């Protein structure tokens, strides 16, 4: 169930360079946790690092759903001092059910919050992917002079950035993202493996009706056994109340 998908931990870009792979500079090293087997997560940030036998870094990436709109996923990679470079590399490899327009061989430099990506001409969809992915890092405000607002045409009306598809989640489920819907409202429905509703409600983003706003909400739920499930987000048509702009995020629900 990969119809389309969508969610972010404080990480910063570190200095680096390279001629055959993306390079990053003018940024401090990424933060790490200090307790073995404990993963640190925080709403509103973009990367998670875990200290264990082998350290890893969780990146927030953006690919293209079948309808050509952006979808957010998370991916664990080996711990690195250049997470921005790792992000560009990972953007060339789309998960099943999605596509990417980001070419390989890109170079990255960062100066005072401005990221500059060179090495190949970025088509509009690729630029949108790169802008959204790199601006999850708090040290990056724009890419090649473009902000998220400049590439918003590639974002769906409701973009869930957390949780990611196929995440194993427990109650309460924390959901974050951004939206541009009529009067800033939309609905959600959390379903179990049988499609039975576990929770449903409406959400109000910080802005809407032509302006993209952010949202964050929590869903308490209860299941007896681990099972597949799904989070559905959608808007009700102002004309006839029908479901429009629906996105489905497959999840693994655990007690």
Show which residues each predicted segment covers.
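Bimodal "functional hotspot" detector
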Residues: 2-12, 17-255
């Amino acid at each position: 169930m990969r119809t389309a998908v969508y969610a972010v931990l404080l990480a910063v870009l570190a200095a680096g360079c390279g001629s055959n792979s993306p390079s990053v500079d003018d940024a401090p090293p990424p933060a790490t946790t200090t307790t073995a087997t404990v993963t640190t997560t925080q709403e509103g940030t973009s990367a998670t690092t875990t200290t264990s036998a082998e350290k890893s870094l969780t990146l927030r990436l953006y690919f293209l759903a079948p309808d050509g709109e952006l979808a957010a996923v998370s991916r664990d990679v080996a711990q690195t001092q250049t997470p921005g470079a790792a992000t560009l590399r990972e953007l060339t490899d789309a998960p099943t059910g999605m596509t990417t327009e980001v070419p390989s061989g890109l170079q990255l430099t960062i100066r005072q919050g401005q990221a500059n990506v060179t090495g190949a001409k970025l088509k509009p969809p690729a630029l949108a992917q790169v802008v959204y992915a790199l601006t999850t890092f708090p040290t990056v405000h724009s890419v090649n002079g473009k902000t998220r607002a400049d590439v918003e045409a590639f974002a769906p009306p409701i973009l869930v950035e957390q949780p990611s598809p196929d995440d194993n989640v427990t109650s309460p489920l924390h959901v974050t993202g951004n939206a541009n819907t009529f009067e800033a409202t939309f609905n959600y429905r959390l379903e179990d493996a049988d499609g039975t509703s576990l929770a449903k409600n409406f959400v109000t983003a910080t802005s809407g009706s032509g302006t993209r706003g952010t949202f964050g909400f929590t869903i308490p739920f209860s299941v007896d056994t681990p099972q597949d499930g799904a989070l559905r987000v959608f808007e009700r048509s102002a004309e006839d109340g029908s479901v429009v702009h629906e996105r489905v995020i497959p999840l693994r629900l655990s007690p």
